[in-house]
């Protein structure tokens, strides 16, 4: 493959996934790490990607990739994370399930459970869980985002704040190198904070593509959650925050 073709293919992968690691690209294109690093540096110089240590992300921090693209990426990783999270939730538990494709995978993994009571602002989660007659599904009111089935706004925030539940299943768009949790929508950030504040145990579910991914709204530190479920060891800066704050780390 010519360099220009490889550059175009790298851009497509970054657009599709939001973030790609150097290791992924080496395996994908069967070239040396040095070659990939040169490619990424060239693309960063052209402002076509944002260079991170160990990978690359989209240069924009204001627009998320589409729900359909996110749904189709990292599916095996999301399923492993979802199964691990589901194994930690007992029958009869109460829980929030957040917006995002990984929380949606968790919802699917919970279908073998019994007598769960779920509050969600994710229409896709409600549609998945409604097939269970013994589940009680409480869907938050608010403004429906047609692009991904998320429900947000002041009404959503007020609704979620009424509850105090056992678990909060939280997704996130990106995690900066200092452990900051990043999102694209300010209204969604406020809802996530409400889920954190009203959950006894918060489980952050993230695949490796979220590490180093850029987004414009800072929700706060990863230290806000009780446990992180992911498929790879987080970058050194994130790991330091996890260790310093005794956050549980589960590699799936």
Regions of interest found by a model, annotated:
Residues 103:
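Conserved SAM/SAH-binding loop
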